[in-house]
Curated annotation (Swiss-Prot):
Annotated ranges, domain Macro: 1-183
Pfam families, per the entry: Macro
PROSITE patterns reported in the protein's UniProt record: MACRO
Organism: Thermoplasma acidophilum (strain ATCC 25905 / DSM 1728 / JCM 9062 / NBRC 15155 / AMRC-C165)
Protein name listed in UniProt: Uncharacterized protein Ta1105
InterPro entries listed in its UniProt record: Macro_dom, Macro_dom-like
Top-rank lineage group of the source organism: Archaea
Family: Belongs to the MacroD-type family.
Length: 196
């Protein structure tokens, strides 16, 4: 894990299983149905237990009968996860980059952060939204993720911890390269070695 400061905020780059994160909230790369699926979505549903599905059925029925629109987010309890909450967002499906995908992805990250603030959550873990089955090019997606997160943090005086959790070491290294390439005014705190 690599941690660094951005003003009063902490950003972390982690490699591993987001369902094991001890952040206050983890973000689920959901589909519009909110009923689970493959990848991160399926893993979170499985780890959280069947109670999660019950809460999401209620949210669908009461607030989103046609499904959660891309770029929006909803929050649920974490149930059997270490995280107390799950923030579910629907990222865009990559259609070549000419259908507003960048804006929708930006809004997906921002919607999650806005919900975190609303619920008093100051430690949130994100997967690489839309970069799996939805086909969004990784480097482009992560530049958008960073921009959305930094735009949120620069206006916040309360300290937040934002974690970017990647499935592979290669993704984590690519993300660190993107951070460096963007020339953000961050202060590297440390490399944190995991005890295995």
């Amino acid at each position: 894990m690599r941690e660094f400061h951005y003003g009063v905020h902490m950003l972390a780059v982690e490699v591993g299983d987001i369902t094991e994160s001890d952040a206050e909230a983890i973000v689920n790369a959901a589909n519009s149905s909110l009923m689970g699926g493959g990848g991160v979505d399926g893993a979170i549903h499985s780890a959280a237990g069947p109670e999660l599905n019950g809460e999401l059925v209620k949210i669908r029925r009461e607030r989103y009968p046609n499904g959660l629109p891309p770029g929006e987010a909803v929050i649920t309890r974490g149930y059997r996860l270490k995280a107390s909450h799950i923030i579910h967002t629907v990222g865009p499906v990559w259609m070549g980059g000419r259908n507003g995908e960048d804006d929708v992805l930006y809004r997906s990250y921002r919607s999650c952060l806005d919900l975190a603030r609303e619920f008093g959550i100051h430690d949130i873990a994100f997967p690489a939204l839309s970069t799996g089955a939805y086909g969004f090019p990784f480097d482009r997606a992560e530049r958008i993720a960073i921009r959305s997160v930094i735009d949120f943090l620069k206006d916040e005086s309360a300290g937040y911890t934002v974690r970017f959790v990647f499935y592979t070491e290669d993704q984590g290294k690519r993300f660190l390269f993107i951070l460096s390439d963007l020339g953000l005014p961050v202060n590297w705190n440390r490399d944190v070695q995991e005890n295995t």
